[in-house]
Each structure stands twice: as structure tokens, then as C-alpha cells.
């Protein structure tokens, strides 16, 4: 564990040090390959054990009504271990496949970390999926467990299969309540089996733009290590407050709202808006001292409908990046004129981490 942590940190720190010297970073960087690497145990828990980082917010979610919920690294580490212990008690074992369909809520991050610790393979799913979509994913994904919000449990009523059903929120007849996880042992978690390295970590379904969605596999080593490139592209640093506009269930959410910021020991900020409100988002970004921002072109096109110049002195932004599709030069120029920051494009796929980007 100590060696895995040291290898990962050494590679991470090199990318932080050489962030502005691309040629040197290319020459010096060697992806770490620690044996049986389990990112949640060997990286996240070790980072959370540090007094300074442990007290830092790992996640902060701001709701539309202005209420917020923050979770420190130390609390997230402990709570995810508790959830892992509870998942074990209801039958989850290494290699099982769990379909995770939640919105931007704390339980999403807890569960994903818990599954990584256990070696349970996560199949992320967007809440936009229909019962027919879910039937297909559960069948082709060989799903053993489903964890979703109570409000979405009804989508599974007509979905056949012998799988554990866990509901987050109000009780649902026939479903196990996620709230029961608080009764599990809060300390002393030890994974029943070693999971890591080349073991499967995530199974994503592609978007299915031109054909039926296909399954894509990522391992415990390939995905977290791969997202060191995503961290480098975004320009994340320890202590940053990172805001990513993305929906859970898609790979971009794991990119920029999970692995990349936590690789950097940054705070993940989530702003839940039923309908996008550019002025409210800018106000929240100023209030929360957001330093790094990632969004699809659609968001940037709506942001430039605002007069950005007055925000220039109020925002703490250092980096702005876009992904999903190329940005129009006119949009990039308008943001630069208003905020003094050049939006940098990046490209990757469900099958990869960040592949190409303006650094």
C-alpha cells in the first residue's frame, strides 16, 4: 500500500511541477504501475489520513435553494468504508456488477468509492434511461445489484432479473433502504478480497450515437492513472475548488467530478440547477472561490449571454476548459474579453481518459 501510494504520488507531483513545461513533462513522465493498485484504498484513503487534506472538503454540493452539504476527505473516506462494509453484508462481493443510477448527490460518491474498495464493478447509468434501456443494460451488463434513487425505482418494476435492489431516499416496498448502511461498522473496514491492478473497475455503455451502445471496460490501474492526464490538462492543483458541469452516468462525470480533482487533492464543487441559470452560476462561482471550471460548449454559449466583464474582479478562476465538442472561436474570444481567461479545448472518449487537449 505504501509503495503504491508513493509511486502514484511521485507521478502526480511531477505533473504538477511540470504543468507549464509540456516538453519536459512528456520527456519525464512515466505512468505509475503499482501492483494490485486500488485507487480508493491506496490513494484516496491515504490522502484523507493526512491532517491537512483530511480536513479539506472533498465534495460540496449546492442545491437550487441555496442549501449546501460539504463532506471532508476524512469523512468521505470513513463513510465510504462504512458503505463498503454494508454492501458486503447484503451480499456484494468482488467481481459483482452494480448499476449505479443517481443524480449529483453525496451517495453517488460514497458508493463509487465503496465499490472500488470492494472490487465491485460499477456500471454508471444516467437517470434519463428508460425501462427498456435499463433492461438492456442489466441483461448485457450481467448486473447483480442496482442502486438508485427512490424516485427512479419505478423504472425497474418491469425489468426482470434476480438482482439486489437498493433505494436511496424514501422507503420503497421490496427494496433495501440505503439508509441501513449507517448501521454498519463505522471503523475497521478490511476488504474481504484484494481488488486492484488489472481487475475491472468500471463498465461504461457508450452513447450509442450511431449504433447500439457498447460496453467499455476500465481497470483499477488504467482509469485512475489515466486520469492523471486529465488532471494535467485541466490544470488542477491541491486545494483547488473545481466545478464541472456534467451529469452522472456519463464518462465525463467520472473524469472531472471524481478522479481528476481527487487525484489533485482538490475540492469537487457541484451546483444543482433544475434549469441552467448563468447569472446564478456565476454568483455561486464567486461565492465559492472556484479556481478551475469545466463545461460543455452549450454552457459557455449561455454564459456569454451575460455581461462577463463585471465578474472579472469577483471570480477566482485560473483555468477554464471545455469538452464534448469543439468551441467556436467567437465564444472563446468573448470569454477571454470578459474574464481574461482562454478556454482550452480537450478531447477524449468513453473508452479513454483525456487524449488531446490545449495545455
Roles of regions detected by a PLM:
Residues 263, 290-294, 304-359:
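Gly/Ser/Thr-rich phosphate-binding loop
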Residues 63-66, 145, 151-197:
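ANL superfamily adenylate-forming
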Residues 142-145, 160-173, 240-243, 269, ...:
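Conserved helix-loop-beta element of the AMP-binding
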Residues 77-85, 197, 216-237, 245, ...:
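Conserved structural elements of the adenylate-forming
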Residues 224-241, 248-291, 306:
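Conserved AMP-binding/adenylation subdomain of ANL enzymes
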Residues 69-74, 201-225:
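Conserved AMP-binding A3 loop
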Residues 54-57, 173, 183-205, 212, ...:
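Conserved pre-ATP/AMP-binding loop-to-beta segment of ANL
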Residues 55-113, 130-135, 220-221:
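Conserved AMP-binding/adenylate-forming core of the ANL superfamily
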Amino acid at each position: 500500500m505504501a509503495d503504491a501510494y508513493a509511486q502514484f504520488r511521485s507521478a502526480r507531483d511531477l505533473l504538477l511541477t511540470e504543468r507549464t513545461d509540456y516538453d519536459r513533462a512528456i520527456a519525464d513522465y512515466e505512468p505509475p504501475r503499482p501492483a494490485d493498485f486500488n485507487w480508493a484504498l491506496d490513494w484516496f484513503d491515504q490522502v484523507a489520513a493526512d491532517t491537512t487534506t483530511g480536513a479539506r472538503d472533498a465534495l460540496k454540493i449546492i442545491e437550487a435553494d441555496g442549501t449546501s452539504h460539504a463532506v471532508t476527505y476524512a469523512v468521505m473516506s470513513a463513510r465510504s468504508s462504512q458503505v463498503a462494509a454494508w454492501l458486503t453484508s447484503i451480499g456484494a462481493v468482488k467481481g459483482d456488477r452494480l448499476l449505479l443510477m443517481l443524480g449529483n448527490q453525496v451517495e453517488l460518491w460514497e458508493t463509487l468509492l465503496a465499490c472500488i474498495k470492494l472490487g465491485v464493478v460499477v456500471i454508471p447509468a444516467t437517470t434519463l434511461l428508460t425501462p427498456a434501456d435499463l433492461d438492456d443494460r442489466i441483461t448485457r451488463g450481467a448486473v447483480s445489484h442496482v442502486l438508485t434513487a427512490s424516485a427512479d425505482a419505478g423504472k425497474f418494476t418491469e425489468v426482470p432479473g434476480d438482482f439486489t435492489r437498493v433505494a436511496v431516499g424514501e422507503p420503497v416496498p421490496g427494496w433495501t433502504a440505503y439508509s441501513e448502511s449507517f448501521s454498519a461498522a463505522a471503523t475497521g473496514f478490511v476488504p474481504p478480497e484484494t481488488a486492484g491492478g488489472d481487475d475491472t473497475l468500471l463498465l461504461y455503455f457508450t452513447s450509442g450515437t450511431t449504433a447500439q451502445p457498447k460496453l467499455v471496460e476500465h481497470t483499477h490501474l488504467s482509469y485512475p492513472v489515466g486520469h492523471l492526464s486529465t488532471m494535467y490538462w485541466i490544470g488542477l492543483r491541491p486545494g483547488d475548488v473545481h466545478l464541472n458541469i456534467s451529469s452522472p452516468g456519463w464518462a465525463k462525470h467520472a473524469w472531472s467530478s471524481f478522479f481528476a480533482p481527487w487525484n489533485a487533492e482538490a475540492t469537487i464543487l457541484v451546483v444543482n440547477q433544475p434549469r441552467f441559470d448563468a447569472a446564478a452560476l456565476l454568483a455561486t462561482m464567486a461565492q465559492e472561490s472556484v479556481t478551475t471550471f469545466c463545461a460543455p460548449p452549450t454552457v459557455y454559449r449561455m454564459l456569454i449571454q451575460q455581461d462577463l466583464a463585471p465578474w472579472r474582479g469577483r471570480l477566482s478562476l485560473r483555468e477554464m476548459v471545455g469538452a464534448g465538442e469543439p468551441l467556436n472561436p467567437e465564444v472563446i474570444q468573448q470569454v477571454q474579453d470578459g474574464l481574461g481567461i482562454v478556454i482550452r479545448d480537450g478531447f477524449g472518449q468513453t473508452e479513454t481518459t483525456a487524449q488531446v487537449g490545449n495545455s
